[in-house]
């Protein structure tokens, strides 16, 4: 089964399409408190997602994490014992690619958010660089998030978990995900032997390769971390011109909400 990797409460989720959700980092380890200064915890209408700060006023997450009441937390490590420099924001504007929220499981699952107020860089807050080039096959990349750490049970950690996975040949994902186009704007990433994966609650978080955000957690298998079932990540490099154009003030090609 294919799952969008979000965490919902007992309310019925009203997304652009309805589908059972799933995604936290399985098979990882607690992240070091200083290795995720760009990581954002997103709460929206009962959904938990991740996100990535890309400059003091802008962040990226998945389009399917959208909701009416979004709360964005920066500089967070322990949810139970927040850092003193934690900052909370809400969206000023949300941008979808390209001028539509009608994304599919394989396409357009990206949202660019302008914050209501810029965040201040601090000990636990700093942006992550946008990609200078796309990652090649077999590149080792890092995943992280507060998602479930069990592939079959909802066990959510107090601190984000991290794991290393690899960029996988897109043909492997096309074999598992029916309808995935050869030129889809996605990255296929995981461990073919299984055991490490994003999972429920990790949606919208970053896939980091060589110190740059290369992917956004989008869709994965159910259960998570199964052998030969990599997850799909929205490919940030393929949306780079759009991202830079919006940040520069050219909103003609999209619709702010």
Swiss-Prot record:
Q: Which GO terms describe its molecular function?
A: serine-type endopeptidase activity; toxin activity
UniProt keywords, alphabetically: Disulfide bond, Glycoprotein, Hemostasis impairing toxin, Hydrolase, Protease, Secreted, Serine protease, Signal, Toxin, Zymogen
- Active site: which residues? 64, 109, 203
Q: List the disulfide bonds.
A: 31-162, 49-65, 141-209, 173-188, 199-224
Say what the protein does.
Snake venom serine protease that may act in the hemostasis system of the prey.
Q: What is the official name of this protein in its record? A: Snake venom serine protease KN1
CDD domains attached here? Tryp_SPc
Annotated compartments: Secreted
Q: Which SUPFAM superfamilies match?
A: Trypsin-like serine proteases
The source's superkingdom equals Eukaryota
**Predominant place of localization:** secreted
Q: Which GO terms describe its biological process?
A: proteolysis
Instruction: Give the signal peptide as a residue range, or say none if absent.
Output: 1-18
Which protein family is it in? Belongs to the peptidase S1 family. Snake venom subfamily.
For the protein in the UniProt heading, the enzyme class is hydrolase
* Tissue expression per record: Expressed by the venom gland.
